Amino acid sequence: MLNQKQLISVLLIFTSTLFHDSFEKVLTIEEFADRPIPKYAEQLSGEALVDYVNRQQPFFEAEYLPEVAEKRLGSLMKMDFLLLPAGMDNVTMVGEPVTNEELPESFDSREKWKDCPSISYIRDQSNCGSCWAVAAASTMSDRLCIQSKGKIKTLISDTDILSCCQPLCGDGCNGGSLMRAWYYARDHGVCSGGRYEEKGVCKPYAFHPCGRHKGQKYHGECPRHIYKTPLCKPYCQYGYGKRYKDDKIYAKAVYGIFSFEDAIRMIIMKKGPVSAAFTVYEDFAYYRRGVYVHTAGKKTGRHAVKIIGWGVQNGTKYWTVANSWNTDWGEDGYFRILRGKKHCGIESSIYTGDF
C-alpha cells in the first residue's frame, strides 16, 4: 500500500510523462504562462509542489525551504487589498502608450543612479504584512534621492507609514494600500527611517529579521503569528536630536501608472523605481532564481514590491524587482518576473510619486 508521499510521487511521474510532449512544444515563457494549470497542480504544496515546478518548466528554479516559505506566506496581505480603496478612485493616472521614444532592451536603476544607495537596499519586513508600507517607503527613498540629484540620501521610514497611516491605509501588519501610503506621504509627511535598531534616524524598522541570515547579526526567531501593528508615536527615537514634525518629508505628487508595459518602463527610466502589487501563489515563496512564471500551487494573498528595471534573458522579457524578504531570498533579495503579460497582476497596480 502506497503512502501519501509515494502516491504524489507516482502522480508527478505519470503527469510529467503525460504532458512531456505538450511541454516540449512550448517555445516561450508567454506560451507557458497562457496554458491552463491542471486542477491537481493547483492543490500541490510543499516538496511535491517544488518537484512539480522544477519538472514542468525551465524558466525559474524553485528550492524547498519549508520554514522560510511558511514564514513568508504567513506575512502576505489578504486578497482584499487588491481592490481600489474606497473613495480613492479619482487617483491621477499617467503613462500613455509609448510610440515615438526608443526604450533600451535592458535597464537597471542601480546602474543609472549610482549616487542613490537606497535603490540597492533590500529591506526585511519580518513577520508582519507590512510589504505595502515597506515597498512604498523604499520607492519614496529612491525617488527622493534621484530627484534631489543624489543630494538627499535619507531613507523614508516604513514604520512611520505602517503605524501612523491607520485606518486610512488599511490594517497595518495585516495589509494595506500602496496608493494610500503615497497619499499619506503627500498629506502628512513621513519621517526618516532605517534598519532595525539603526541609530541616527527618527524611526527605524520596528521588527527584527526572523532567524539567521548570512553575514547579519542574529536577533532571534519570530513568533509563529504575525506581529501586532506598532503604535503610532508622534516622536523620534531617543537620542535622535530632532523633533518628529521637523524631520518629516512630504511628497509633492502622487499618481498611478496605466498598465502599458512601455509606459511603465519609460517612467522608471526617467524618474526611478515604482511600487507595485501582485497576486502571490505558493510556488513564488520557493523561488530561487530565474524568471518567475506561476506554475502550480494555491493563491495565497497579495504582496507589494519595488520594480527597479527590466531585461531579456534567452528571449524572455522580465521585470527586475526588489523584494522585502532579506538578501538571502531569491537572487540576493531580488526576483525577476515575466514582463508585458500582466502576469499575476504585476503591471496592474503600480503607484509612485514625486518629491
PLM features per residue range, with description:
Residues 4, 8-9, 14-355:
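Catalytic-core signature of thiol
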